[in-house]
Each structure stands twice: as structure tokens, then as C-alpha cells.
Amino acid sequence: EYFLAKTKEAFSLTANSKIDGVDLAMKTILEEAERARRFGFTETEYERARANYMQAMESAYNEREKTKSGNYVDEYVNNFLDKEPIPGIEFEYMLVQQMAPNIPVTAVNELMKQLVTDNNQVVLLAGPQKEGLKYPTKEEIAALLKQMSSFDLKPYEDKVSNEPLISEDIKGGKIVSEKADDVYGSTKLVLSNGVTVYVKPTDFKADQIMMKGVSLGGTSVFPNDEIINISQLNGVALVGGIGNFSKVDLSKALAGKRASVGAGIGNTTETISGSCSPKDFETMMQLTYLTFTSPRKDNEAFESYKNRLKAQLQNSDANPMTAFSDTVTRALYGDHPRAIKLKESMVDQIDYDRILEMYKDRYKDASDFTFYLVGNVNLEQMKPMIAKYLGALPSINRKETFKDNKMYIRKGEYKNEFAKKQETPMATIMFLYSGTCKYDLRSNTLLSFLDQALDMVYTAEIREKEGGTYGVSCNGNLSKYPKEELVLQIVFQTDPAKKDKLSAIVVEQLEKMAKEGPSAEHMQKI
């Protein structure tokens, strides 16, 4: 890859560390580079890397009729600047299929010996400037580099398991009803455990199926005094992996497959999201089952998470954007107990066992979950797997909804302004408007039109005419729970000397849009 400039190609290694862990981080990445140079990669490591590369090429080939224009632009630019050939994905995929299986791991290991050298080395070290904080000196770093060849190292042991994702015998459910919707072209399935599934075939992409499962409840059902655990629920619950697999082991088990699943617990809902290649649909279903039923506890992974979080929070106050975000939250929600600002001193109060309990509570009843499967779907092929895995999800027929904790954006017109010392002075301005709006397809569509029209207006008036900013971000959002509400945010950054003039233009153009609506030219482009 290029290093700082296109005239300098380099093999580079990067690490982020705690403030007091710079020496350890540097030594660790140098040890791994030297280990790879001295002993090479293992056969199993290489097989996984090759399988993942082949899968990515296969996916690109399958999507060859749906390639985005931007991808072609990138290829043309690379061809013009670097003389990179453009044979097309059909030829590239055929070539990779022929060549990749015949490239041995020894060839890659020989390349590592050429890439990791004892000369022409550059080290960049960047960190916060703080009184009392010491970093390694140039001489200390140079001494560490000289020690590389004498590091006491052993070959890497790649622990690989052939264990299936699900080792237990799953007794699946049944599809108890099936109904086609001719208006939307979808099919509704109801399973024996109460799970509802909507399947909608689309041809936007040839090698993709998207999944979303939703249930009402979320973190709103937990008391306010658990806000520290609530704030870290999504980060901590699955930090140890799922089933019998740590996160690292799971990535090994999924080598060569294109399937991923994640869980998310918001204020009023708990969700399961996933995507896969059609050929890996069963793998996505298996991951969904494990994500629902089997969060894996790993105390070591949890401690690592806490250490990373502490390092992140240590210097967050020095970041002007952190201060800006905190100020916005305070301005919108005041002293509401759920509008917490997590501090480093709070991290040790995170209760891992309690978070696992909270997670399991949210996913112990699938009977009120509705799943949506969209993409290159084959309903008849998928139905047995839907019944087996989604039909096996736990069900206790719990009838619940979210709890309204009254965390509303305050009413009225307010202006908050604060200053923070910066090396390069810059003003960040946010306008936020909120109000009641019916949550339906029409409102969401109109809001999308408004976002796009405002983007065009502000690009013309503020970026091009005034030259005052690189861009203005307009983002409207409709929410249904806990109440139907519309929030419109308009954000931009500029020279502090220009902020008042540009802010006036933002308001002027927004009021004009409210009175006149988008122009015919804008609607044509939308």
C-alpha cells in the first residue's frame, strides 16, 4: 500500500493503545512482524485468508450485472494514474480461480521476508499532549527496532476447531400458515412458536439476502438506575462470542462464507440484523439461532473491552467534538437520568453478569418477533431452514411492549453556544427541529425528498456561493416509538468568523423551503 504519498509504497503495521501502553503496543506489533518473517504463516491461516479472498471475488462476479458506477470510476482512475489494467471481473475471477489454488503458503512466506526488513524503517507515533505524559524517545524506538531480529519467539500455533456452529440436535418448529401479499409481492409465514416472517424477493443485488428481526421492549423495560449497564449493553453482551466460539474462533469458522448476524437493543426495541450470500443462508440462520440463545461469557474478553473503553474515555474531554456532542445531549434532554455521560471512573461499575441477564431477558421470547427477509431469496428452498432455526427459537408467549420513560426533546426555542480552545479554530453549528408527525410510508418518503432538496439548496447557497464550508449535512428522522416524532438536523462546520452569516442563510433557506417547497428542478434531480 502507499505510505503518505503515491510515490512511496510500504508494508505498514498500525496499533492503537492505552496512554500508558505505547511501549507494549509497539513491541507487540514488531514481535508479530518478526514472527511472520522468521517462521511464516501456517497452512491453516493461509487457507482461511485464501478462502475469504475467493469468496469476495465470487461475490463480485455474481454482482457483475449490478456493479455501481463508482466502482467503474475507481478502476478508470487507477488505470489512468497507475496504469492498472482493467480486464473486467469475468476475466479476473477466471484468473483467480486458476491461480489462487496453486499459490502455496511458502510463496507468501518468502514475500514476508522481503517486506519486513531491517532498514528503511519509518515509525510514526501520535498521541495526546498532556502534562506528565511521557512517550518513548526516538533513541528508545530505534533501539527497539534493532532488537527485532533477536526477539525470543516461537512459531504461531493456529488453534483450529472443526466443530460445527451448532453441536446440539435442534428440534425445529413448523410453518403453521402462509399467505401471499400481491400488493407488495411478499409472503407472510407464521411459525409454530409465534414467530412471524415476511419474505420479499428483490433483484437489486444478485448475491445478497438481508434480514431484520424486531420486537418491542428494548432497554426501556429496565429501571433508570441501571443506566450504566444499559449504556454498555450492546458493547458487552456478545463480547465473548456466541455458542462455543469466541469472536476470533467464530471468524475462523466462517472463513470462506459470507454470512453475518448481530443483535441490537435500543430504547424501545430489540433487533436481530443479518446478511448473507444466498448460498450461505443456512449459516445465517444458524448464527441467528446462536445469537438469540447462546451469548458466550468470556471474562478475559470483558476485561479487554473495559481497558479499551477506559483508554477511549481518558482523553475524550480534550476532543472538541465530544464536548459538542455532550452539550447537544444536555440541551435536548436536560437532566434526564438516561441522558448519561459515561466517564472513565464509571467503567468498573459495569456488571458483566447483569448485562448477560438483561440480554437473555430481551431474547428469551421470540413469539413477538417479526422477521423480514429481503433480497435474492428462493422461498421454497428457504422454508425448511426458516422452520428449523427460527422455529426453534425460545417462546414463552410473553405479551409486552416498551415502557415510555418520558425522555423527550424539550419544547421551545433554545440557543446554546460555547467555546473551546482549538489549534485550528473551527465552528460547528447544529440546527435541530422536532415536532409531531405521523409515522407512515408517505411521511418517510416526503422526508427523504426534503433531505435531498435541502442538501442541494445548501450546497448551492453555502458551499458554492459563499465558499463557507465543505458541505452541509441534512438528516431527517421519523420515529414511531415511544411517540410519533420528526427530528430534522442541519449540521455544518466553518470558520468562526463566518458562522453567523451562514447560520442566517440556513434559516432563511429553510423557511423558504417551508413556504414554497422544493423547486421543479430539485424534484427532477430527486
What are these regions (language model features)?
Residues E1-V105, N120-G127, Y198, K205-S294, ...:
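M16 family metallopeptidases and their MPP-like homologs
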Residues E47-A51, Q55-E58, N78-N224, E357, ...:
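Proteolytic maturation boundary segments
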